A protein has these predicted regions:
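Rossmann-like NAD(P)H-binding beta-loop-alpha module
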Residues: 125-206, 213
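N-terminal glycine-/serine-/threonine-rich beta1-alpha1-beta2 phosphate-ribose binding loop
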Residues: 1-101
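Substrate-binding/catalytic subdomain of NAD(P)-dependent oxidoreductase enzymes
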Residues: 183-286, 291-293
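A conserved regulatory-domain signal marking ACT and ACT-like small-molecule sensing domains
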Residues: 319, 324-435
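A short hydrophobic/small-residue beta-strand
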Residues: 105-106, 384
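Rossmann-fold NAD(P)-binding glycine/threonine-rich loop
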Residues: 90-101, 110-148
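ATP-dependent carboxylate/acyl-activation modules
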Residues: 5, 281-356
């Protein structure tokens, strides 16, 4: 059988930082293999950067680089546009312009998708071309394509995952080496995992943007970052991690998107990011250091987990490269795989969310205290699953894991506990993956 004739596809790349440079290198290294397997010959024909005098470490002639991103998008010889510049503007306008010209777009920009995803999805559908973004949520982990395609007809109930490598590295160091939060963060910064200002990572904003994208795709719902409840890891202590360990759990920062039913019977979506106690026998408990994983639960498929490197120039570029090949192939075949408009679905307020909880309280160690504490739990419909007492002389620390309870009921329980004379202080309160 003769070899198929290759179709030339000229690519314009917007941005050439770590991911962009790694992508250009991958195209150079793998173009021969791609051509043999798919019949598509990829060529990076233009790269838009802020400063053309900076050495990007890629094998490209100087005339490929330009500071005019609009010219790259509008160039009629450019077939596919790859956006890896980051930020919302001018990335949004450039992506919309490319789509309006009938050019498929590949992006790794989670902030853009989280804030303006539906606008871009509708534009891509109207143009009949691809908008692909596998790299936007979990680096090299292929989760977007399964949600868009393989699981499109699956009645998904929950998608949750470790989608921020920085916080997972910090929590792993605290767990495995007993490092304090401050020391683990400093090490992450020294290794380049954390920015000098780590707020977006450690306070859950980065994971929140990714959770919005995941929820939108998993449930076809209109979800933006403002809909996502988030707590970070800056308040997690080594003592919390050790207490969790004694109760058979580790602590992970999880992004959770789940479909449920409101008290009045309407479908609702809960989307949140927070530190979570994960049982040691759960697959997510084995995801350590800077690795990411996404755990999917569905009515028919059961449970699936996608695992891999969630950050880094080359792993992320690998996902972009895969999208680029798909976009080029669909362009040759004359069709795209648009997402289109999203549905209005009620976003559950955090008070309505049900979860299991871990909490610790310091109490006077005297008769009758435990029964008083248990009465407060019961009075607010919060059922205790397990309890551990650690003696501290005249004081004792009580550690509880509850069964599923409504967040609002848990908050009322905390207020009730705070009113007991025997309760000296309320310590950590963390959610638990539980029944």
């Amino acid at each position: 059988m003769g070899q198929m004739e290759a179709t030339d596809v000229r690519v314009g790349v917007l941005g050439c930082g770590n991911v962009g440079a790694a992508l250009v290198t991958l195209v150079d290294e793998q173009s021969g293999v791609v051509s043999e397997r798919t019949g598509i010959s990829l060529e990076v024909a233009a790269i838009a950067v802020r400063n053309t005098s900076v050495d990007r470490g890629v094998e490209c002639s100087a005339d490929v680089f330009t500071t005019d991103a609009e010219a790259v998008v509008n160039d009629p010889s450019i077939d596919v546009v790859v956006e890896v510049m980051g930020g919302i503007e001018p990335a949004r306008q450039l992506v919309l312009a490319a789509l309006s010209l009938g050019k498929p777009v590949v992006t790794a920009n989670k902030e853009l998708l989280a804030a303006h995803g539906e606008e871009l999805y509708v534009a891509a559908e109207g143009a009949g071309v691809d908008l692909l973004f596998e790299a936007a949520v979990a680096g090299a982990i292929p989760i977007m394509r399964p949600l868009r395609e393989s699981l499109a007809g699956e009645p998904l109930t929950r998608v949750m995952g470790i989608v921020n490598g920085t916080t997972n590295f910090i929590l792993s160091r605290m767990s495995d080496h007993g490092a304090s939060y401050a020391d683990a963060l400093s090490e992450a910064q020294d290794l380049g995992y954390a920015e000098s200002d780590p707020t977006a990572d450690v306070e859950g904003f980065d994971a929140g943007a990714k959770a919005a994208v995941i929820a939108s795709l998993a449930f076809g719902a209109r979800v933006v970052p403002a809909d996502v409840y988030h707590e970070g890891i800056s308040g997690v202590t080594v003592e919390d991690i050790e207490a969790a360990r004694t109760m058979g759990h580790c602590i992970k920062l999880l992004a959770v998107a789940e479909r449920g039913t409101s008290v009045d019977g309407e479908v609702e979506i809960g989307v949140r990011v927070h530190p979570t106690l994960v049982p040691f026998d759960h697959p997510l408990a084995a995801v350590n250091d800077s690795f990411n994983a996404v755990f999917v639960e569905g009515g028919a498929v059961g449970e699936l987990m996608f695992y891999g490197r969630g950050a880094g120039g080359r792993p992320t570029a690998s996902a972009v490269f895969g999208d680029l090949i798909d976009a080029a192939g669909n362009l040759r075949r004359g069709h795209g795989a648009p997402i289109g408009a999203l549905s209005d679905v009620r976003i559950a307020p955090i008070g309505d969310i049900k979860s299991a909880y871990y909490l610790s309280i310091e109490v006077d160690d005297r008769p009758g205290v435990l029964s008083d504490v248990a009465a407060v739990f019961g009075g607010h419909d919060v059922s205790i699953k397990s309890m551990e007492q650690v003696g501290l002389g005249a004081e004792a620390q009580l550690r509880f894991i509850t069964h599923l309870a409504r967040e609002s009921d848990l908050q009322e329980t905390l207020r009730g506990l705070g009113e007991l004379d025997a309760v000296r202080s309320i310590g950590s309160v963390l959610r638990v993956i539980g029944d």
